[in-house]
Amino acid sequence: MTDIKKEQEREELHRAIWAIADELRGAVDGWDFKNYVLGTMFYRFISEDLTNYINQNEIEAGDADFDYAKMSDEDAEEAREGLIEEKGFFMLPSELFCNVCANAANDENLNERLERIFNNIEGSAKGSESEADFSGLFDDFDVNSNKLGATVAKRNERLAKLLNGVKDMNLGDINDHSIDAFGDAYEYLMGMYASGAGKSGGEFFTLPEVSVLLTRLGTVGKKEINKAYDSACGSGSLLLKCAELLGRDAVRNGFYGQEINITTYNLCRINMFLHKIGFDKFDIACEDTLTNPQHWDEEPFELIVSNPPYSVKWVGDGDATLINDPRFAPAGVLAPKSKADMAFIMHSLSWLAANGTAAIVCFPGIMYRGGAEQKIRKYLVDNNYVDAVIQLSGGLFFGTSIATCIMVLKKGKSDNKVMFIDASKECIKVTNNNKLTPENIDRIVDVFAKREDVAHFSHLADYAEISENDFNLSVSTYVEPEDTREKIDIKKLNTEIAEIVAREQVLRSEIDKIIVEIEV
């Protein structure tokens, strides 16, 4: 099948999935209803994934007709302990998505049944290595919420439609490891929900094109890495782009991230499972990254990719202990209370491996503002940590038209220069937003890797030049934009004016002659 045909089929599948999801929500706001659709997709996925895992083992053992979904709960119990160790959780056959779905329309206690099943799934992981990955995973799937209906009967009716709607989504054969239909559909739906939600959506979802750019910047010349980390991981889209581009096994020791919003944290963990990242290959924490980081025992990280919130408030020097925090102390100053951007930069730098790269989306103001931010920039440049600054176009993110930039950090640079790239024109217009194309991304990464000057696009600046500019790291300071105004040839213009004046004199003389003749 050609790539074009595959893409067409993928787009058709996406449209069909969105139509189902949109119809299911009814009068409920799409942003509020997303947890139900995405949660149900996850329920279907782990049911099919577990069933397939068990069936494959039985087929290999010689029982070609075995089907775990048809097994009795009593017989299945014998496998509980082993499956929890291998898969991280356990489900009885009666709890599987297909079996619950088959009777959903006539189940007067469907809400209670689903609640019990979700509790059992989470409970099965308690006391095991996977407990943290499953704990609270279904908390945002409230089967008794009035959003589903005013009465129990109405709520159960909506839940039954939800189950059957997700059942009707063509998510392929889970045995086919060449596709990632569940993960792909999940990412697509999150993108649609984020687009509809505007600003709030942008806080949990980084567009795929930007994720590709960050990952490629962070992995130039590498085919595998030790660990990947995101300090503000949202729904995990950036971390999973690393898995997609490098391959899951090429990230040898797993994916790490921290997210402050508990709903988004749950979405992230679900996203990991749907993309077939094993429970033992990811560690996502829910806490404030700046004041309560959760991965001290796992750092340093070879790849850090992040799109942290822009200019959010934080405690800063309101907490006297933070200036002594090993992440922030080296700069001798904390990021301003009203703008935590540089705190995320310092946090990422601190946890970056000596052979690693961090690619971080930044609010442009941190590149030129004075005060504490200027002092932190000076610290970064003095110690040769800034590898590149890349200016992006505006309108690349949900909910904001801000033209953001990317700061690339390294601890093991081969030179003491900073690459500045003006990629503000590298995009195409799609409806009301801009979008990076594969060609745009290729050009940015190619120049970044070659570290060469390109007129009106890139400039490799040395320490002296940056110091002369008071450690201003704005791309516009170092890359002169192309003058697109029409070029005027003054000599040619003057000649044309002289010819016009001469012609005017000739015409006046002729007019005067005509007037004289008329008067006669």
Name each model-derived stretch.
Residues R44-N57, Y193, K222, L246, ...:
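A generic secondary-structure signal for well-formed alpha-helical elements
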